[in-house]
Amino acid sequence: MAKQKIRIRLKAYDHRVIDQSAEKIVETAKRSGAEVSGPIPLPTEKSVYTIIRAVHMYKDSREQFEQRTHKRLIDIVNPTPKTVDALMGLNLPSGVDIEIKL
């Protein structure tokens, strides 16, 4: 019999929020009797935007903004129906994007 696996990818701009969410997911899965591997930190994606400060001239005066996207990966091996129900009822912050693959 093949092992079932749930793979959860989390994305957020704030690393504290994503770590709290990952901890909640791991704790919930372990409490329901499933094996958990993770959270595994994935590489942080960094986007840099450069804009000209002035409206009409002064091209040498520029400002840079950056946006960092933190990512985590959690694998839940051999999930029970109780695990799936517990994960569906979990309340996570709005700043976290969740992708679930079965």
UniProtKB/Swiss-Prot annotation:
Molecular function in Gene Ontology: structural constituent of ribosome; tRNA binding
Task: Say yes or no: keyword Methyltransferase present.
Answer: no
A GO cellular component term found in this entry reads: ribosome
Q: Which superkingdom, per the lineage?
A: Bacteria
Coiled-coil intervals in this record?
A: none
> Do you know which InterPro entries this protein is assigned to?
Ribosomal_uS10 (IPR001848), Ribosomal_uS10_CS (IPR018268), Ribosomal_uS10_dom (IPR027486), Ribosomal_uS10_dom_sf (IPR036838)
**Which GO biological-process labels does this protein carry?**
translation
Pfam family of the protein (one): Ribosomal_S10
| Record's function text | Involved in the binding of tRNA to the ribosomes.
Question: What is this protein's record name?
Answer: Small ribosomal subunit protein uS10
